[in-house]
Curated annotation (Swiss-Prot):
<keyword id="KW-0699">rRNA-binding</keyword>
<dbReference type="GO" id="GO:0003735">
    <property type="term" value="F:structural constituent of ribosome"/>
</dbReference>
<protein>
    <recommendedName>
        <fullName>Small ribosomal subunit protein uS13</fullName>
    </recommendedName>
</protein>
<dbReference type="GO" id="GO:0006412">
    <property type="term" value="P:translation"/>
</dbReference>
<dbReference type="GO" id="GO:0005829">
    <property type="term" value="C:cytosol"/>
</dbReference>
<dbReference type="GO" id="GO:0019843">
    <property type="term" value="F:rRNA binding"/>
</dbReference>
<dbReference type="GO" id="GO:0000049">
    <property type="term" value="F:tRNA binding"/>
</dbReference>
<comment type="similarity">
    <text>Belongs to the universal ribosomal protein uS13 family.</text>
</comment>
<comment type="subunit">
    <text>Part of the 30S ribosomal subunit. Forms a loose heterodimer with protein S19. Forms two bridges to the 50S subunit in the 70S ribosome.</text>
</comment>
<dbReference type="InterPro" id="IPR010979">
    <property type="entry name" value="Ribosomal_uS13-like_H2TH"/>
</dbReference>
<keyword id="KW-0694">RNA-binding</keyword>
<keyword id="KW-0689">Ribosomal protein</keyword>
<keyword id="KW-0687">Ribonucleoprotein</keyword>
<keyword id="KW-0820">tRNA-binding</keyword>
<dbReference type="GO" id="GO:0015935">
    <property type="term" value="C:small ribosomal subunit"/>
</dbReference>
<dbReference type="InterPro" id="IPR019980">
    <property type="entry name" value="Ribosomal_uS13_bac-type"/>
</dbReference>
<dbReference type="InterPro" id="IPR018269">
    <property type="entry name" value="Ribosomal_uS13_CS"/>
</dbReference>
Length: 122
């Protein structure tokens, strides 16, 4: 198992898919990394040489924000919105949908399980 950016990459999968196990790397960025290292998309992780794994690791460290740094940055951005007291920050603070979705019905994922209200049954 190769270890890149603190994540164990599965060895039996294609490089394009295996790189997506790293938080912050999706299909587009994974294909960009493969292109920079000049690896065929159908190669598997266990077929990579140590030099190629090292190149991938260097490119990710140099060019992309991934894993813990990305999670920290996202958390700081959300905290900043909450401290500002803007609409999006208030929605985060209250645990409601942030991007304009309806809340009269639905939004159960964001709001949590339904709470029983006394006297609601007929």
């Amino acid at each position: 198992m190769a270890r890149i950016a603190g994540v164990n990459i599965p060895t039996n999968k294609r490089v394009l898919i295996a790189l997506q196990y790293i938080h912050g790397i999706g299909p587009k960025i994974a294909s960009e990394i493969i292109e920079k290292v000049k690896i065929a998309e159908d190669r598997r992780v266990n077929q990579l040489s140590d030099q190629e794994v090292l190149q991938i690791r260097e490119i990710i460290d140099r060019d992309y924000v991934v894993e813990g740094d990305l999670r920290r940055e996202t958390g700081i951005n959300i905290k900043r919105l909450m401290d500002l007291g803007c609409y999006r920050g208030l929605r985060h603070r209250r645990g409601l949908p942030v991007r304009g979705q309806r809340t009269h019905t639905n939004a159960r994922t964001r709001k949590g399980p339904a709470k029983a209200i006394a006297g609601k049954k007929k």
